[in-house]
Amino acid sequence: MTVAINNETVVLTPNEDDVQVNKGKTLETSFPPLKGDDLKWFPRSSLPAEIPAIDIGKVSTKEELEQFLVDIRKSGLFYIVNHGVPEEVSINVYNAFREFISTTTEEERMKYYTDTHFQNGGYVPFQGSSIRGGNLGKPQKDHVVKYFWRGPEVINRTPNEKFTEAHNMHHTETFKVAEKVIRTIFKALKLRFPDFDPMEFENTINSKKMFFTNRIYPQAEPSDEEEITHRLVPHLDTSFITLANQVPADNGFQGLFVETGDGKKVKVPGIRNSYLVFIGQSLSYLTKNYLPSALHGVDKPPSDLFEGSERSSLITFYEPAEIIIPSKNINPNPEETSESCPFFYDIGLTVNDPEGTTWDFVKNKFITGYYAD
């Protein structure tokens, strides 16, 4: 199958049968480097009410922490602004991946393709994964190409030193943001649940527990045998929290969306040098569904917005500690909760289990269905 991307020819063909993990699709194209000043960012004023923009450095007083807790429970998704990470950190890591895709063949990329991406990074080809399959649903292949990165404390698969430096820098800087967000969440929880001791979850804060995926959603149409509803189907992350940086499509198409508890679908515009925070199912599980995980996905563009709909994102997953036990000191009222960790229930767990589980168990259950057939 052949499609046009940025006036260039893109050939999408099945990989050879001996490729590891799955067959995916071959993506032969080039992606020009991004320049922050040239991207069509949305103003902060365009954010819907369901997605607050929070200056995490200004959340410290009792009143600020109480409002923070109200804000993050609206949809399980919020923007962090004034976070201290220079824009060039994200632009450089986007461009490192874009250069990798643009200057290599699919055969060369397969050197970095493996079924242990979650441990020490690596490349995942276009349609090489299924977030719905990982969440135990009917698989739909993800219309995205990815590179996983575990961080500087792990030896990652990497094509070159420049690629390594850009990815390590992004990991290092976003870990600082994630840690600040997590500690602020702990402080806010203690206001609502005075017996809660943040030290209970202290083992969560570890840079080795964080990895990210560098993603490109190319302007590629589905093949004739496919029926797709989304570029990435609606899902709930299994993470503790997820940080996301996104750049907008050239044509203004807003692909990323979140669904609120009342079923309202809210588009998430790309705000310059800002990080989205998604509450994940692990944090919902540990707080007995008090903090709602964010149901989100990426829409496919309608035919009139197909041209110019390519977009990129950096999705950072912060994992919980290895032992996951719902806090005995967080006991929300029934009206304060929502069913926010269905994957945990689907694999036989409950928030009322005093024994809890292990992250290894949860992760391996997810990975079983993640790689597309």
Swiss-Prot record:
A GO biological process held by the record: cellular response to phosphate starvation
Residues holding Fe cation: H235, D237, H296
Gene: dabC
Keywords linked to the UniProt accession: Dioxygenase, Iron, Metal-binding, Oxidoreductase
Cofactor(s) it depends on: Fe(2+)
UniProt-recorded Gene Ontology molecular function terms: dioxygenase activity; metal ion binding
UniProt-listed Enzyme Commission number(s): 1.14.11.-
Cofactor binding note: Binds 1 Fe(2+) ion per subunit.
Species of origin: Pseudo-nitzschia multiseries
Induction statement: Up-regulated under phosphate limitation and by increasing partial pressure of CO(2).
Reaction(s) catalysed by this chain's protein: N-(7'-carboxy-7'-demethylgeranyl)-L-glutamate + 2-oxoglutarate + O2 = isodomoate A + succinate + CO2 + H2O; N-geranyl-L-glutamate + 2-oxoglutarate + O2 = dainate A + succinate + CO2 + H2O
Protein name as catalogued: Alpha-ketoglutarate dependent kainoid synthase
